[in-house]
């Protein structure tokens, strides 16, 4: 993994479990969000199995949450609760319907200390089509996009910052 914006380079060995109710697109959006924010202490949580936790977070030894990352289209109430519990909150939406979600919640999100990004939904689908049970992939992040190369193909996934704090 190479993040040219942050000068962050790492070889990550990740095991990602797909929840039975989780789409492949969501799982891959979650992987992208992880890579975009990769740093020491960043871990996947129980995800959809635990509504009290985000998809990804950083917690300190005293169990304080310094970074809370949700993937999808969480309700404004969930984001508000997260912003009270964590030092920094980020949301990555990825669905084709995320435009509607953003327009409906925009005014409520505007008053919260949260950064919101929207992945290009078609690019996420293209990335999902490359998934294999066991795979090696290379991710290079520059600006607001990630170039992904796998044994079965390559693609680029871009994202748009909707609100950055």
List each language-model region with its residue ranges.
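Long amphipathic N-terminal alpha/beta scaffold segment
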Residues: 46-52, 57-61
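A short acidic, amphipathic alpha-helical/loop segment
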Residues: 78-82, 104-105
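Catalytic beta/alpha-barrel core
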Residues: 68-72, 91-93, 118
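Mid-length scaffold segments of soluble, non-membrane domains
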Residues: 81-95
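Helix-rich interaction surfaces within compact, conserved domain-sized segments
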Residues: 1-19, 90, 98-160, 165
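Short active-site oxyanion
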Residues: 63-68, 87-90, 113
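Conserved catalytic cores of phosphodiester-cleaving nucleases, focusing on short active-site segments
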Residues: 56-58, 65-79
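Acidic-basic catalytic patches of nuclease active cores, encompassing PD-(D/E)XK
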Residues: 3-48
């Amino acid at each position: 993994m190479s993040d040219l914006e942050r000068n962050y380079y790492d070889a990550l060995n990740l095991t990602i479990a797909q929840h039975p109710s989780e789409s492949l697109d969501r799982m891959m959006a979650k992987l992208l969000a992880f890579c975009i924010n990769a740093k020491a202490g960043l871990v996947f949580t129980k995800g959809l199995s635990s509504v009290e936790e985000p998809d990804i977070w950083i917690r300190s030894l005293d169990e304080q949450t310094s970074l809370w990352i949700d993937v999808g289209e969480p309700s404004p109430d969930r984001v508000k609760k997260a912003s009270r519990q964590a030092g920094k909150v980020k949301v990555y939406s990825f669905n084709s319907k995320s435009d509607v979600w953003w327009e409906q919640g925009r005014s409520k999100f505007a008053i919260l200390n949260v950064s919101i990004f929207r992945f290009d939904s078609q690019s996420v689908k293209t990335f999902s089509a490359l998934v294999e049970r066991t795979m090696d992939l290379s991710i290079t992040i520059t600006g607001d996009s990630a170039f992904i190369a796998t044994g079965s193909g390559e693609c680029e996934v871009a994202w748009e910052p909707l609100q950055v704090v």
